[in-house]
UniProtKB/Swiss-Prot annotation:
This is DNA topoisomerase 1. The gene is topA. Residues 129-557 form the Topo IA-type catalytic domain. Keywords: DNA-binding, Isomerase, Magnesium, Metal-binding, Repeat, Topoisomerase, Zinc, Zinc-finger. Its cofactor is Mg(2+). GO terms for cellular component: chromosome.
Length: 689
């Protein structure tokens, strides 16, 4: 029997670590948390200083029994759960269940699961850090008090199965606020004038800039005609040439948030999938003869700090592969994470290149590892150097400007370029070599009419970025928060963008009226700051909870008394039940709308419903536009009020009217190209990506 017992969260992690520690150590998994607040009741005594009532999680009895059996036989028990607040809390709960001494130095932490890192951590065990535990307890108790007080009110007044929470309610608010911006958006007309110019055999484009040495806004066609009629022939002169050298630095290595964003954009991974695959890479991959090794550092972090050892190894790799001129000369500028001295997400060894690892990884593991590896190595490389040139092209009072850039030294861009929404700005645009006084010929002057566009709906990547920018939640909360608002049917995804549902808007309005603090961004940010202060030992967790609950309790009492019961009426489905002949109605279920017999519970007939696209019928303005299929299985769009309304369209209506003729706009797909066009006139615009 091994003298030393080591407890970690997962079997994969246990398997990897046991190989490093040898026969004197037995490593077993707790399978995550073993204790938590009960699901059947509040589990927090608000009359006894918010004392939590922890119980063994249902189904974990056999695990706990096994842990106790091994702990009883071992001389030493080490708690090696993850190196964050959640991991610290798991270690504390294990110590309580196993009745370990509070002052015992039995907590080991490592940021990467490699032989050296694990062995080093066992040389320096420490006591459980209660400040970190208390910060996690405070978050858990806060979320319990909010959820278990608001949810019953929503069940009673709106619909069973609903929930609200500190982070999820703010995320829902962001989606709804953006939708309201789109609904209230009034498009404004504007014009641009682009010129094509020729110098010798070279052609290049430039945009209208100034009239009479001042910016001149082209709001209407009349403004455009003022410029075009002022032009005299096709001869222009280069009146100014500005050349600059621009340095572009690489992006920092990944944090949890930036990894989720970039994986969504480059790999089309959802946040939950990104974290699942990252966990596999962290906990260990079987590299056959090399053994099982964790390929990346811990994946829940808000730090961009990099250890000196990792920097030195990256520098060695870059020098050998690209030459010394490609290594970074910059001093470190990474931010320190709020939770503790974590590192950024990086490969545990730069020398384990994606190509070398490919045969050991699944397709998803390889793609994510390659992304993490390239981002990290690029972060340690020299900046790119761009030569930029700006040309002023003038005729009389009219000035056009052309901007160009070429890459002088690729630096980190040899390996990796961060995805940007404005990716066109990264492309090379060569201009002919021109000097002040040179003459050029305009071969084409092209005015174009445009209309301002509403702000785009949130993609998952953009929502994660906004939550991080606002300091809402923590790295570990982004993925489950986004999952929750979808599972509750508060939002739905359309073309990879979030749209609020009717139910989501109803819940939001009730929470906004009766629990304004819960959806207040500033309140949520302040609460995160207080949780950080608990972790730092500057304030007690009970004081933070009491400061919140004393006013929140009054909000709950007011909501119970004043919130009116909202009846979400069943919509008529427009057809009769084929079982009993009663009218069918449309009901809202966990996974969206479905048809059910109005004679329930006597008749339990249900059936799937045609898919609503969330747009009102542009013909009758009463029904919803629904997706249907023709006899040849081709998708078309019709009105849910059919046959009373015979609206039909092969193209998908988008819920906005044409700014030119006020007819409805549709999304038109031709091959791989999608654009928004008017159903009536020649108006068109780019589709939201």
């Amino acid at each position: 029997m091994a003298d030393n017992l080591v407890i970690v969260e997962s079997p994969a992690k246990a398997k990897t670590i046991e190989k490093y520690l040898g026969k004197k150590y037995k490593v077993i998994a707790s399978m995550g948390h073993v204790r938590d607040l009960p699901r059947s009741q509040m589990g927090v005594d608000t009359e006894d200083n918010y004392e939590p009532k922890y119980i063994t999680i249902r189904g974990k009895g056999p695990v706990v029994k096994e842990l106790k059996k091994h702990a009883k036989k071992a001389k030493n028990v080490f708690l090696a759960s993850d190196p964050d607040r959640e991991g610290e809390a798991i270690a504390w709960h294990l110590s309580k269940i196993l009745e370990l001494e509070d002052s015992k130095e039995n907590r080991v932490v490592f940021n990467e699961i490699t032989k050296d890192a694990v062995k080093e951590s066992f040389k320096n065990p420490r006591e459980i850090e209660m400040n970190l535990v208390d910060a996690q307890q405070a978050r858990r108790i806060l979320d319990r008090l909010v959820g278990y007080n608001i949810s019953p009110v929503l069940w009673k007044k709106v619909k069973k199965g609903l929930s609200a929470g500190r982070v999820q309610s703010v995320a829902l608010r962001l989606v709804i606020d953006r939708e309201n911006e789109i609904r209230n958006f009034k498009p404004e007309e504007y014009w641009t004038i682009e010129g094509e110019f020729r110098y010798k055999k070279s052609k290049f484009n430039a945009k209208f800039l100034h009239y009479k040495n001042k910016p001149f806004k082209l709001k209407t066609k009349k403004d455009v005609e003022k410029i075009t009629t002022a032009l005299d022939g096709d001869q222009f002169e280069i009146t100014n040439v500005t050349k600059k050298e621009k340095t572009r630095n690489p992006a920092n290595p990944f944090t949890t948030s930036t990894l989720q964003q970039e994986a969504a954009r480059k790999l089309n991974f959802k946040a939950r999938k990104t974290m699942m695959v990252a966990q596999q890479l962290y906990e260990g991959i079987d590299l056959k003869k090399q053994g099982t090794i964790g390929l990346i550092t811990y994946m829940r972090t808000d730090s961009t700090r990099i250890s000196d050892t990792a920097k030195a190894e990256a520098k060695q790799y870059i020098t050998n592969k690209y030459g010394e001129s490609y290594t970074s000369k910059r001093k470190a500028s990474g931010k320190q994470g709020d939770q503790d001295a974590h590192e950024a997400i990086r490969p545990s060894s730069t020398m384990r290149t994606p190509d070398d690892m490919k045969s050991f990884l699944t397709k998803d593991q390889y793609r994510l590892y390659k992304l993490i590896w390239e981002r990290f190595v690029a972060s340690q490389m020299a900046p790119a150097i761009l030569d930029t040139v700006s040309l002023d092209i003038t005729q009389g009072d009219i000035k056009f400007r052309a901007n160009g850039q070429t890459i002088k030294f690729k630096g980190f861009m040899t390996l990796y370029v961060e995805t940007k929404d404005d990716s066109d700005s990264e492309k090379e645009n060569k201009l002919p070599k021109l000097e002040q006084g040179d003459k050029v010929t305009a071969t084409q002057i092209e005015p174009a009419q445009h209309y301002t566009q509403p702000p785009p709906r949130y993609t998952e990547a953009r929502l994660v970025k906004t939550l991080e920018e606002l300091k809402i939640g923590r790295p570990s909360t982004y993925a489950p928060t986004i999952d929750t608002i979808q599972k509750r049917n508060y939002v739905k995804l359309e073309s990879k963008r979030f749209v609020p549902t009717e139910l989501g808007e109803i819940v939001h309005e009730q929470v906004k009226e009766y629990f304004p603090e819960i959806i207040d961004v500033e309140f949520t940010v302040n609460m995160e700051t207080l949780l950080d202060k608990i972790a730092e030992g500057d304030i007690t967790w009970r004081k933070v909870i009491d400061g919140f609950f004393s006013s929140f309790k009054q909000d709950v009492e007011r909501a119970e008394e004043e919130m009116e019961k909202i009846e979400i009426k069943d919509e008529p489905a427009g057809e009769d039940c084929e079982v009993c002949g009663s009218p069918m109605v449309i009901k809202m279920g966990r996974y969206g709308k479905f048809m059910a017999c109005s004679n329930f519970p006597d008749c339990r007939n249900t059936k799937a419903i045609v898919k609503s696209i969330g747009v009102k019928c542009p013909k009758c303005n009463d029904g919803d536009v629904v997706e249907r299929k023709s006899k040849k299985n081709r998708v078309f769009y019709g009105c849910s009020k059919y046959p009373e309304c015979d609206f039909i369209s092969w193209d998908k209506p988008i819920g906005r009217d044409c700014p030119k003729c006020n007819q409805y706009l549709v999304e038109n797909k031709k091959g791989k190209t999608t654009q928004v066009i008017c159903s009536n006139c020649d108006y068109k615009e780019a589709a939201q990506k």
